[in-house]
Amino acid sequence: TVKNLVEIINEQDTTYSPLSLYFIIDNKLISNQIEINSYFDTLIIKTSLDKEIKNLVIYKKALFNADQAIESDLLNILNPLINSESVWKSHALYLMAEYFFAKDQKQKSKEFFNQIANLENANPDIKLQAQKRLNRDLSE
């Protein structure tokens, strides 16, 4: 039941708590976005996750909120990744770039895509997609 899954999240188990939250989200068992965000915060703040697993949870929280979030909220969620050397940094930059592109804020979008293009350890697929977007849609 949903109650059991929430209990597992609150137990702060490094393996089963994230899996419980993802199961709830994937199966749309809870529709309240504020409630889901509080479970993300439990994982991020209270659960002793490996650093890159924690960063993945942060990225998933941003993805979960991206459709409804305002710019400042999305940036606040992603800042720990954007200001790090995490393997998820290029993903976070790409999400922000696409967010601004979808909102027709081309200059901001271009800045984020350029950050990806200039990132040494960027995910190669994301770097390629960023370069394509820059060449195809954002070139002068």
Placement of each model-derived feature along the sequence:
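Extracytoplasmic/periplasmic/luminal assembly and interaction segments
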Residues: 1-48
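Soluble extracytoplasmic domains of inner/organellar membrane proteins
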Residues: 28, 39-140
